[in-house]
UniProtKB/Swiss-Prot annotation:
<dbReference type="InterPro" id="IPR040442">
    <property type="entry name" value="Pyrv_kinase-like_dom_sf"/>
</dbReference>
<comment type="similarity">
    <text>Belongs to the HpcH/HpaI aldolase family. KDR aldolase subfamily.</text>
</comment>
<feature type="binding site">
    <location>
        <position position="179"/>
    </location>
    <ligand>
        <name>substrate</name>
    </ligand>
</feature>
<dbReference type="Pfam" id="PF03328">
    <property type="entry name" value="HpcH_HpaI"/>
</dbReference>
<feature type="binding site">
    <location>
        <position position="178"/>
    </location>
    <ligand>
        <name>substrate</name>
    </ligand>
</feature>
<comment type="function">
    <text>Catalyzes the reversible retro-aldol cleavage of 2-keto-3-deoxy-L-rhamnonate (KDR) to pyruvate and lactaldehyde.</text>
</comment>
<feature type="binding site">
    <location>
        <position position="179"/>
    </location>
    <ligand>
        <name>Mg(2+)</name>
    </ligand>
</feature>
<feature type="binding site">
    <location>
        <position position="151"/>
    </location>
    <ligand>
        <name>substrate</name>
    </ligand>
</feature>
<feature type="site" description="Increases basicity of active site His">
    <location>
        <position position="88"/>
    </location>
</feature>
<feature type="site" description="Transition state stabilizer">
    <location>
        <position position="74"/>
    </location>
</feature>
<feature type="binding site">
    <location>
        <position position="153"/>
    </location>
    <ligand>
        <name>Mg(2+)</name>
    </ligand>
</feature>
<keyword id="KW-0460">Magnesium</keyword>
<dbReference type="GO" id="GO:0000287">
    <property type="term" value="F:magnesium ion binding"/>
</dbReference>
<feature type="active site" description="Proton acceptor">
    <location>
        <position position="49"/>
    </location>
</feature>
<comment type="subunit">
    <text>Homohexamer.</text>
</comment>
<dbReference type="InterPro" id="IPR050251">
    <property type="entry name" value="HpcH-HpaI_aldolase"/>
</dbReference>
<dbReference type="GO" id="GO:0005737">
    <property type="term" value="C:cytoplasm"/>
</dbReference>
Length: 267
């Protein structure tokens, strides 16, 4: 199979185009496929806070493959063995949580690259990513099609942001508002003015460095604000939260004493 590996999501980010996404926490291929038919530019399949196994992630990648929505996998952490597995099952774009230093960022980059450029274990002939060895020259061309995004979500990470942005192989930086606000001393209050100021400044620094800037905003007005600040890959909802809101709203139409969905300002 003489196939050329491409990553349209990465190319659009490189051009500075805005990409609107949805967070998937439901852990099922069925729900992932429903989301893929909605037309979001990207879908974050969450392996950090949602109870996804490697097989769950694999099945969700299969489910969304026929559609235009680009899957992004967030593993529970950025270890070399786990990154190897996620890449082998066919993920082209990764979002790595809790990256606090440039050294961590370099280790993550190395874990995604085959030798001599990194430390990714070689197993293309048994991997979905290489169509079980049928994609010719997979190892030679895969680096250009990988998109690596890292999460900055602590005061330490903010202090090291410029150094992280200088790491070759990092395509974008995602601001994690929930953990960041807690780290700054404002737990469960990403809307605090000081947190908002830091988010705005960070987004602008990321874009000024030539990297893509990402954010998850479950409140539409916050999503619009981040877009105005320059964020260009923004998730505007979480499937499980949207589902629970819809259930509450429908029940409130028929049962007295029900007030509809509760207001959720953060993830």
């Amino acid at each position: 199979m003489n196939a050329l590996l491409t990553n349209p999501f990465k190319e659009r980010l490189r051009k500075g185009e805005v990409q609107i996404g949805l967070w998937l926490s439901s852990t099922t291929a069925y729900m992932a496929e429903i989301a893929a038919t909605s037309g979001y530019d990207w879908l974050l399949i969450d392996g950090e806070h949602a109870p996804n196994t490697i097989q769950d992630l694999y099945h969700q990648l299969q489910a969304v493959a026929p559609y235009a929505s680009h899957p992004v996998i967030r593993p529970v952490e950025g270890s070399k063995p786990l990154i190897k597995q996620v890449l082998d099952i066919g993920a082209q774009t990764l979002l790595i949580p809790m990256v606090d230093t440039a050294d961590q960022a370099r280790q993550v980059v190395s874990a995604t690259r085959y030798p001599p450029y990194g430390e990714r274990g070689v197993g293309a002939s048994v991997a979905r990513a290489a169509r079980w060895g049928r994609i010719e020259n997979y190892m030679a061309q895969v680096n250009d099609s990988l998109c690596l995004l890292v999460q900055v979500e602590s005061k330490t990470a903010l202090d090291n942001l410029d150094e992280i942005l200088d790491v070759e192989g990092i395509d974008g930086v995602f601001i994690g508002p929930a953990d960041l606000s807690a780290s700054l001393g404002y737990p469960d209050n990403a809307g605090h003015p000081e947190v908002q100021r830091i988010i705005e400044t960070s987004i602008r620094r990321i874009r000024a460095a030539g990297k893509a800037a990402g954010f998850l905003a479950v409140a539409p007005d916050m999503a619009q604000q981040c877009l105005a600040w320059g964020a260009n890959f923004v998730a505007v909802g979480v499937d499980t939260m949207l589902y629970s809101d819809a259930l509450d709203q429908r029940l409130a139409m028929f049962k007295s004493g029900k007030n509809g969905p509760r207001v959720k300002g953060s993830y």
